[in-house]
Amino acid sequence: MSGARRPGTSKRKRNWHIEHPSFREERSQQLRRGNFKTVEAADSLSKAWLKCGEGFQDTSEILSLASEKTGITEKHLELSPKPKTETTSKNASELPNIIWSSSESDFSDEDKTLPALQRDGRHGPRADRLGDRTISCPEDEDIEDELQVIDWEVNSDKEDPGGPSECEDDKGTLDISDCDSCASLTSDDRLCEPSEPISTEILEYSSDSEKEEDPEHSLFIDSESPHKYQADFKSDARWCLVSQTDSEANSAEPTLTPQKYTVKFPKTPEYSVTKKKLLRGGLAERLQELQNRKRSAISLWRHRCVSYQMTPLGRKSGVLTVKILELHEECSMQVAVCEQLAGPPITSPPGGLAPRPGAYLKVLFTRETADHLMGHPQDIIYIFPPWQKLLIPNGSCSIILNTYFCQKAIAKETVREDLYSPDISLSRRNITLAQTFRIKDITDNSSINQTTYDSLATPGTGWTHGHEKAEQHLIVAAPLRNSLLDIVESQRAGLWSGVRVQVVVQRVYSLLSRDGARSQQGHTVGHADASGAWSCLLVQDACGMFGEVFLNSTLWKSRQLEGKSCSMSGVKVLQKATRGRTPGLFSLIDSLWPPVISLTEPSCGQPSGETKTYLPPPIFCYIFSAHPTLGQIDAIEDHISKLYQPPVVRCLKEILQTNECSTRCSFYARVIYQKPQLKNLLAQKEIWLLVTDITLQTQDERDHSLPKTLPVYIAPSCVLGPEVVEELALLVSYNLLFRDAFKDNGQIVCIERTVILPQKPLLCVPSASCDLPSPVTLDELSALTPVNSICSVQGTVVDVDESTAFSWPVCDRCGNGRLEQKPEDGGTFSCGDCSQLVLSPLQERHLHVFLDCPTRPESTVKVKLLESSISLLLMSAASEDGSYEVESVLGKEMGPLLCFVQSITTQQSSCVVTLEEIELLSTEGATAAQPPP
């Protein structure tokens, strides 16, 4: 085709103010004058794509292309601009111009002069053809003069309209090649070629980075042009496109240096399947690299802010200092209305409006930046470059974008905590596009589009131009949601969610405060009770999701909420719990699964249908913390919810006969012995309770599969109420209700989230039908007797442990064993506790004997005897001088003795069973353990 352009058929759109974005680190190398018709275009497109996310800076016709070695595979593109025949419409010319300016241009260096075009008058006509506005984008002050002008040759620039051109409006081709060696070429090595009207087909290319040569990875670009080029991404071949500096040459031609012959393989779907590594497009990979580099840059900058105190270096630094006046949230972005305190001056808004004394800005923060800043009204924020300013014609104020690098300063003035509490959540505004663009055709006046979800129901203000005009938004109570996930989605880091969710309280219990939970809740969450425990609720929503809520109220008030449907608001997420992290919590959740009624699907305030499909047990849940003043958990209904599952109380016989492992169980039982004895209410340690009920005591004596008594281990993580601790301090038998105890491998353990309550006597049940036999029957010592259990022992004394046999005097009044003997008083003893002389002290003795038990003939049974048994054993074995001979006690029968199994040690040839003789708790004043109704 001829290079001549038909008048009136093809025109450029010059009124769209097309601005070419430039990328960082693509700086000019030299300043070229107007007599240069061509310029070197050998920069790497991959470099531009890799750097495109560091901030867009607007330019008009100035496009810097730096010749830097990229060290990656070559990318060859043939661009064919299509003819532009349409003219600029009237509506297009009437569109408002949005002026973009960067913090590194007129904001950061406002005193810099526009280079190149403004200093060289010969470029004026060209600037008029490409656009009517120029914006300078200097990167640094030290390279502000190293700018390069690229002249894009068009038909209107040619003196000879019939001659060839580099780029034609009708049909043209611009070949751009990415290479490593084009920067080292001289002007003599640069060749040009007249462009021909061709169409381009761009195939996918390999993104592999292997350095080995493989002809199978060659890329073939086919087009209608007689010039067909081949690029080998696995070889050292380099294609480069250069522009000839000679004025007689007006075209460009690709040059191959050095020449290498490869085999061409067209890309087909069958070919891609046979490859071990699929050839992928590089755009997605480069976008991922760009996002990773962006996140890395932000993380590194925040780390520097924490390590070093970064302060603005004055006006030249381009740091914008603002003061937050009002905050709200729109479309997951935090919008801050700020007052500019320092930094580059704000230009006058378009429309000829006079600037006001004190510039007001709207600063947009992303969710990650807002979580890092945790800004509040009256806070001072430093916004470091590169930030961008957006001026909207007829707009209220300027908008600051690209605020990734921000730092909060400590405000000098004292802010009242009652007005700007850090625990107050931001107002949430749902703004539709119809309201933004004032579309009258859409007549959706529903309250959902005009609702501000604010947990405090405080009025929000929409800023227009400073403080003069404030638009009041409609504030209504937050709708009642049905999913706990709404709290998670609406919560901001460090803030409290104002979403109201309807939940059912399944369990109420206490948990010991941990250091991790205390640090996450902070010092303002409240305080635990005297024992250092927190009141907790296990709640479940209508969708089946569980959550654990830390409260600040007393436990007895929280127990009134169990089983009721409640409204929960003013909470925040402490952590996400999984089965691996909190197995105790999920063992309790598994006991409540599956639900007794059909669940509903999550919905945002709209009707939701029930789902009856089978749902697996949940694999995660959330742990919440209620605000000390704003947190509210109120009962909606007085009656018990249908979703509530009360603990199923069963008898001990039924629990032991089930083969379920790692499950929760609830039962009534009477405590007949405890070890150790608690003498004060604060001494909580590992406790073993020996319990029984009527079902174990009345079973057939010939059935030895079930024990008569059962040991229950109370772990230190199990919180005991004050009423239970008082029961443990008494030396009487008592009845307890064990809720949600953990059964594992036939052993019952009270762990965290297990509730132990004193049992109240049931008046409706006759006591005679449930009374335990007196005395309580125990199992005999056998090979099946476990450790930490009680049993009955009977046998013959075969030996005495003389190393542990001794006696000492004690006070006959108080039993104090630390008596003082005074020689001046004739060797009498005195008690320090009673402050009196002990005339007839009692003798306490300590003795271990070895028994030969017929129930365990192959084992050595060692028993620590009580004082009563020692006195009975030594009654007839005393000599005239008061000493005892070992031979006098051997062969005597002992028993039956009630003993606690301390340990069972298995050696190579024998087994040693260590027992301790005990006394069961008194049954005076105790009622029988009631079976479940």
Curated annotation (Swiss-Prot):
Please list where the region (Necessary for interaction with RAD51) is annotated: 175-469
- What domain of life? Eukaryota
Q: Where is this region: Disordered?
A: 1-34, 67-174, 205-224
Q: Where is the composition biased (Basic and acidic residues)?
A: 16-29, 71-87, 119-132, 214-224
Q: Is DNA damage tagged as a keyword?
A: yes
Establish whether keyword Electron transport is in the entry.
no
Q: Predominant location of this chain?
A: nucleus
Keywords of this entry: DNA damage, DNA recombination, DNA repair, Nucleus
Please give the InterPro entries that the UniProt record associates with this protein. DNA_repair-scaffolding, DUF4502, DUF4503
Its subunit composition reads: Found in a complex, at least composed of BLM, RAD51 and SPIDR; the complex formation is mediated by SPIDR. Interacts (via C-terminal region) with BLM; the interaction is direct. Interacts with RAD51; the interaction is direct. Interacts (via the C-terminal region) with FIGNL1 (via N-terminal one-half region); the interaction is direct.
Report the function annotation for this chain. Plays a role in DNA double-strand break (DBS) repair via homologous recombination (HR). Serves as a scaffolding protein that helps to promote the recruitment of DNA-processing enzymes like the helicase BLM and recombinase RAD51 to site of DNA damage, and hence contributes to maintain genomic integrity.
Its protein name is DNA repair-scaffolding protein
Q: What is the lineage of its organism?
A: Eukaryota, Metazoa, Chordata, Craniata, Vertebrata
